């Protein structure tokens, strides 16, 4: 196998794990969307520390991973694709696959790989665009 093929496979594997290839932090806000709302965003990680007895699973039974958010399904329906715009002007796409006891109204919880990443994210005021 050539070095180029090995490097390409490594990049694709990393991107698949992190979702970074498909949800870049610099993605543009959607031109068309179903709903726009201001929300408070926090972050969480898989495992009992942040996700309690559900561990690594979301409300719909998928794995907690970057690219997933927890929502109040009365505000953002489960399985919706959303675009999240952060205070610094960057944004990313995510899918609503989880819920949470503290996630009520205009709040979202963004999945991260680690608890340290979730703590670093903190709490931010964001704009959320429901795309599909």
Task: List the model feature ranges, each with a label.
Residues 2-9, 19-21, 25-132:
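Solvent-exposed, well-ordered loop and adjacent helix/strand elements within mature globular domains
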């Amino acid at each position: 196998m050539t070095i180029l093929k090995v490097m390409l496979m490594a990049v694709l594997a990393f991107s698949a794990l992190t979702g970074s290839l498909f949800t870049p932090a610099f993605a543009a806000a959607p031109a068309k969307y179903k709903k726009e709302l201001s929300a408070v965003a926090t972050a969480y990680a898989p495992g009992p520390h942040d996700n309690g007895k559900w561990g690594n699973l979301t409300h719909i039974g998928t794995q907690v991973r970057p690219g997933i958010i927890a929502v109040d399904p009365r505000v953002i329906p489960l399985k919706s694709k959303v675009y999240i715009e952060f205070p610094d002007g960057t944004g990313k796409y995510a899918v609503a696959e989880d819920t949470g006891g503290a996630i009520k109204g205009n709040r979202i919880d963004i999945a991260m790989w680690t608890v340290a990443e979730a703590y670093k994210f903190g709490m931010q005021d964001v704009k959320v665009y429901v795309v599909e």
